[in-house]
Amino acid sequence: MDLIAQLACELNLKAANVEAAVKLIDEGNTIPFISRYRKEATGGMDDVALRALDERLSYLRNLEQRKEDVILLIDAQGKLTPELEQQIREATQLQRVEDLYKPYRKKRMTRAQKAREAGLEPLANMIIMQASAKGSALDAAAAYVNEEAGFDTPEKALAGAADIVAETVAEDPENVADLRAFTQNTADIVVEATDPAEKTPYEPYYSYDEPLRRIPNHRVLAIDRGEREGKLRVRVNVDGAAATARLGSRWPRRQGVFAPVFDAAIADGYKRLMAPSLEREARARLTVRAQTEAINVFAKNLEGLLSARPVRGARVLALDPGYRTGCKVAVMDETGKLLDHGVVYPTKPRHDVAGTKRELARLVKKDGVNTIVVGNGTASRETEEVVSEFIAEQAPGLRYTIVNEAGASVYSASELASQEYPDLDVTVRGAMSLGRRLQDPLAELVKIPPQSIGVGQYQHDLDQAELSRTLGHVVEDVVNRVGVDVNTASASLLGYVSGITPSVAKNIVAYREENGAFTDRRQLKKVPKLGPKAYLNAAGFLRISGGKNPLDATSVHPESYEVATSVLERAGVATSELSRGGVPDIEHRLGSISALASDLDCGTLTLIDIVNELKKPGRDPRDDAPEVVFSRSALSIDDLEPGMELKGTVRNVVDFGAFVDVGVHQDGLVHISKLANRFVKHPSDVVRVGDTVKVWVEKVDRDRKKISLTMVQGK
């Protein structure tokens, strides 16, 4: 197989660009580096396209290796024919290779194998070929009686030959492929309760069936979980008669004395040898499909969360609510440095509201706090009410917001947190994490395992290795899209930079602590274990503010400094201008970019990126994200009425809709049918985590604490 041609065809890309991308990947370059700094070679592929190519490349290479292995295994048995080898080599899917190998795979002794060893294969061939015979089928079988092997009567000999026919039919690759497609396209999934009287979350599935090809992914995952917990019984229902007839249609003229035997063998081959595995396979494919989509949804949600806009200039008082142990307080300056910490008790059992307000007033005045953050966990609603009252009574210029606590406890108790703040209590670390999530969500959330951030569906039921790999790619892509200040970034953040391993990230921090702040990107070459390849892949994503060269604070790669300097000269601008906000009118000064690219012997795509960066050096793409929604007064679910218009923040996106925080401590659901005034294939096509949206209350169930919202006015 020509891998380059195959990839180009499948992904609708130019072969030359595919070949260049594959070469760059094989040379050890990272996806973010190739996407950002090798656009001429790849034709401008973004990180999504490159990851798809890399994934498919791995699959096709594994496929080719498996083909070679299978060919060798069959050849070792002396059963490889030119036709079979050609079929294997032309296969484009691993499943097809395994289907072709199945008849030759070593397996435990089967009824058919036992019959073959007894010399009944010629009789089986007579059945398949519908050979003419004198007398009955039993008369023909009498010649193959083998008492020593246990086939001591014509009936047993004929049954043994039928077993060979059944296995031959069931293992034929074309039959398997055809019946697999038939099962996928026509079968139903049928679900029933193991105990219909028991109350469980799975009651909607107690008597449920739906075609395999139509069942939504979230239902598949719910049914899988219910089955795993022993609450549901699940089977795949296939029209066995139709499947058997379809199998038999390959031999349309079954006549003569062997016809009834052949018919029975085909039916047996399907029911006993094909149906169980095809039904298991159909369930497995359904689960893989659902899990793959769930991982993709999780990845999109995580990307939205990590790409949230930082709240710069915020001096934050963070409250991690609780009851018996009180609310933990952490006050941080604009850089996230801890200024104060303590505990207040606004909730039961102490319910010291007056004392809490006094302490808040003291800290706000002492530390110049302008923003309060409240975690959304236990006791959040009561804590928010006290904060709202405090602002109304004593600090009308103050603002507050609710922050998602998911993963904060995981971080605060982690080894990383104890290394960062060895002298602080776990509870203080947790409160600090909440405040820093507002100041710089990306820098704080990279310290937490992505699976713990809580923006997916059924994440604990998913393939954890695949989930971890996919989410790791998301974090890597966002970190490199934003860029990292090498003098302030934690080792956790640096570890996601292109070309930087976790151990090298720690070395960067150690070098910084020992030698002082980096003032030149070239100093990175002195960091232990940061070799030439790592420097090439990392340099453009590591920023140095206030260094010797203003270009070090931009996304311009050091390999392009000469071009960038020439561009500035053409524009009549000194490099020092970059430190004062860049050159907004640089495009007007330069004229034709394509002509300039030719003059400077630089690729047009690369030059466009350089010019855009010089226009606004160090621009943070997160500044395009929606602003954080702040409040000054608290709402509760009792305040909501149908028709009420609200502004909210998307907290989670799932297959069936989006959950929106409207400030009442219970996220409302916008069903997929109410996201837009048009057909929506998936909610992620309309919204993503972190979006600020306008919604209308449709229905409020106060007893069950459920809120139904719509994004379509008047719906």
Q: What residue ranges belong to the model's regions?
A:
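C-terminal accessory/binding modules appended to enzymatic or scaffolding proteins
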Residues: N12, R309-V311, E476-A510, R632-V670, ...
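Long, charge-rich intrinsically disordered scaffolds of nucleic-acid metabolism proteins
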Residues: R96, L100, T401, G407, ...
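A glycine-rich phosphate-binding loop feature that marks nucleotide/adenosyl-phosphate handling sites
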Residues: A181-I189, L319-Y323, G377-A379, V403-V410, ...
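Duplex nucleic acid-engaging cores and interfaces of nucleic-acid transaction enzymes
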Residues: F33, A49-A52, Y59-A318, G322-D423, ...
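Low-complexity, acidic/Ser/Thr- and charged residue-rich accessory regions of DNA metabolism proteins
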Residues: A140-P154, S207-P211, R225, R235-N237, ...
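Long, charged amphipathic helices and adjacent flexible linkers at domain junctions
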Residues: E281-A299, S452-G483, A597-P642
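Accessory alpha-helical DNA-binding modules that contact the DNA backbone or grooves
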Residues: T30-I31, D46-E148, D340, R481-D624, ...
